[in-house]
């Protein structure tokens, strides 16, 4: 499948998700190539139906600029109590609809939006599907003051940590001024155990394991089909 065909599938999946958004609701919007198609589909609804939303919050400046360019007003997370629906992408999704997110470095804001949402839908293509969470480094955001100790601790646990670097080869700094340590992309058969370990590690701000959060995944398959998979 070439990129044009893949983009067409992503667009179809994103359009399906856009149809699920209720008018005058509070919407959370993630980021990524598939989410960009979702935002375009919202813009088409706005133009065609006069579609509007009560509030929109987003997890990236890129999505914010795209939404504002289509005439939507984007609010801060602090401006809302709870999103009715959040639509986002994911770096990996397993059979239980648990996922790894944060490849773009915005995992803390992504999780904040997610936990303040009544419903979460992820849009992905089939390349993101795995049986057990693996095949993509797990990002862990850490405080600079404890980063070295965290790195050594992760090494001792056999988690094969790597510093995330920017384009200049220096440590990547998040929106909140923290570092990211990427853990090994090895299979994670017990993700809840790893999440619990990270949740109780001093200096860890947030991690990219999104467990028991996603309600529905819309999957674009290479055979041209769109699958709608819901949490059991």
UniProtKB/Swiss-Prot annotation:
Entry GO terms, CC: cytosol
Assigned keywords, A-Z: Isomerase
Pfam families noted in UniProt: Rib_5-P_isom_A (PF06026)
Xref: CDD domains: RPI_A
EC numbers, comma separated: 5.3.1.6
Residues at the catalytic site: 110 (proton acceptor)
Annotated pathway: Carbohydrate degradation; pentose phosphate pathway; D-ribose 5-phosphate from D-ribulose 5-phosphate (non-oxidative stage): step 1/1
Listed InterPro entries: NagB/RpiA_transferase-like, Ribose5P_isomerase_typA_subgr, Ribose5P_isomerase_type_A
SUPFAM superfamilies: D-ribose-5-phosphate isomerase (RpiA), lid domain, NagB/RpiA/CoA transferase-like
GO biological process: D-ribose metabolic process; pentose-phosphate shunt, non-oxidative branch
Keyword Isomerase among UniProt keywords: yes
GO molecular function, one term: ribose-5-phosphate isomerase activity
Its job: Catalyzes the reversible conversion of ribose-5-phosphate to ribulose 5-phosphate.
The protein's name: Ribose-5-phosphate isomerase A
Organism: Lactobacillus johnsonii (strain CNCM I-12250 / La1 / NCC 533)
Gene behind the chain: rpiA
